Regions:
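Conserved beta-ketoacyl condensing-enzyme motif
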Residues: 1-11, 173-193
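Flexible glycine-/small-residue-enriched beta->alpha junction loops
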Residues: 1-49
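Condensing-enzyme catalytic core mediating Claisen C-C bond formation in acyl metabolism
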Residues: 13-20, 24, 44, 54-58, ...
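N-terminal leader/propeptide and maturation segments of large enzyme subunits in energy/redox metabolism
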Residues: 28-81
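Phosphate/pyrophosphate-binding loops at sites that engage ATP/ADP/AMP, CoA/4′-phosphopantetheine
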Residues: 44-50, 157-173
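Stable alpha-helical structural segments in soluble proteins, enriched in small hydrophobic residues
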Residues: 108, 153, 157-166, 186-194
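Short glycine/threonine-rich loop-to-helix capping motif typified by GTGT followed
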Residues: 140-145, 180-203
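Hydrophobic alpha-helical bundle architecture
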Residues: 167-177, 201, 205
Length: 209
């Protein structure tokens, strides 16, 4: 391992072409996999299908509204909630606007010491108070200890990060969270995994605004 005073981590997803069988689980699609997440969540918490669908639609509308404000966003079109609710079904219960677009892009962040950061003369710097990572090879899907209704790695990483940062009540102490939003149900479930919503209450929190 090497240490550096200044580093620039960069992320650049690129979606290439490939066959359906070129996968860990052949013929499994991303919409299908996350539709299973939605079904598992709905079954575990006894959620009404229409309530789940409307909560996901609210998330999609919000995300499109945010994209419309970003000049660098791939998709910058606002979508009415009725359009989301009535969009073509991709993988039940996920409709067209519950699924992300396919984009090539990149992002980077410059990470350095507080001393060097101050010398840059910038006024929009942030301090990293905690940094945690949890990864999985997906084998939990083969065990009955995981019911498929949540992201185990998100729960592990967030618990460690909150402990490192000294956060006891994330719902009250955290004012901004940027989450992976590949599908609308992803954000819904992540709200609970990050303890912003109580388990089984994310739908109600979204619909309540």
């Amino acid at each position: 391992y090497r240490a550096a005073h200044c580093a620039r981590p960069k992320l650049g997803p690129q979606r290439g072409r490939g066959t359906l069988n070129n996968m860990t689980w052949p013929n499994a699609s991303a919409p299908g996999s996350f539709a299973q997440l939605a079904a598992a969540y709905r079954a575990k918490h006894g959620s009404a299908p229409q309530d789940l669908k409307r909560a996901m639609a609210h998330i999609s509308v919000k995300s499109h509204d945010n994209g419309a404000k970003n000049p660098k966003a791939h998709l910058r079109n606002k979508i009415p909630i009725d359009t989301v609710m009535n969009s073509p079904m991709i993988a039940e219960p996920l409709g067209l606007y519950d699924c992300c677009g396919v984009s090539d892009g990149s992002a980077c962040a410059i990470v350095t010491t507080p001393e060097i950061a101050k010398s840059l003369g910038k006024n929009d710097l942030i301090t990293v108070k905690a940094l945690q990572l949890a990864v999985s090879n997906g084998l939990e899907a083969q065990h009955n200890s995981w019911d498929g209704s949540y992201f185990a790695t998100t729960r592990i990483a967030s618990k460690r990060a909150y402990e490192e940062a000294g956060i006891r009540n994330p719902r009250e102490e955290v004012n901004l969270i940027e989450v992976h939003d590949c599908f609308s149900v992803t954000e819904l479930v992540t709200m609970e995994d990050l303890h912003i919503s109580a388990e089984g209450r994310a739908i109600h929190d979204v619909l309540d605004g």
